[in-house]
Amino acid sequence: MGSKAMFVILSCLFGSALFLAQGVKEVTVTEIPGVVAAGAKWKIAWQGTNNADGLVGTAEGGLLFAQEQPSTIGKLDKDDHYSVFLKDTHGAGSVTIDSRGRIIAAQRSCTDPGRSANLPPCTEGPMVSVLAPERKVLADKFQGKPLERLNDLVVGKNGALCFSAGTAYCIKSDGEVVGLGNDIRSNGIMLSPDDKTLYVTNNIVILAFDVKPDGTASNRREFAKLQGGNGDGMTIDAAGRLYVSTGAVGIQVFSPEGKYLGTIPLPRDVASVAFSGPDKKTLYAQGRGALGPDGKEFRTPEGVRNNAKTIYKIPMLAQGFKGRAK
């Protein structure tokens, strides 16, 4: 049996097991009132070698996630069974679902050195596109120049769509792409439950903007300062609390007013987070690295980028915002 086949079998067998193995940290979750109970346990939902980024919950209580290097969108159903949801995604690195049920992705094209050599050559640059039910490019340029490597995206109930690509941008209702500031070094991007506030990571700071339904953003301000680490993928709960992935530090939680509430530690460095599951009270998070078929930390040959990832889940007291997928 090949190593890939064995790896899939191990992932299925141990996908729901508590994860205490070589290459990960033992963590203790402390209470954050109204957010997570003391002693709550992370479990593995999925692990694999082909990446998992830009997580978004589905209406059925499952998960979609971008797998950039094989150019696919992966899917977990409500029981954490994995399948390939979409193929030929042009190197999608993040995915979301709008109010019309369309699958929208930040497509990174050929910008990652770990891209599979088995894929056909690509000539188009990064773009924000609808992938399903019909494919449509929404943005591929800013001020006449091709977009840089894309990171994350969010779309409001009203259709406002904003994304990060080095800095941060919004797509106005007329299709114009507007930048939010050349001095922003953004990765994660998120909207408040009422779609009126846009949150943007800027290294150790979270910025906030007022945003209108047409995608116009204004009133830039500092929302919060991270307690260690740099901001990455974000999500939001029904009470408007913001959850920020910060690598080895964990998932930092902030009130709607920007007050730091606490950190949920993760066994691995975290880069993406999303609510899903029954009643949207399960928090999913992507951790860097995974177990190989031998039960040890997966390694690649020297010089080959390691895209192995583990998706964890944890029961929450807080409920994710149900008004949007992300």
Outline where the language-model segments fall.
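Bacterial N-terminal signal peptides
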Residues: 8-17
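Sequence-structural signature of mature extracellular/luminal beta-sheet repeat domains
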Residues: 21-326
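Bacterial N-terminal signal peptides that target proteins for export
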Residues: 1-9
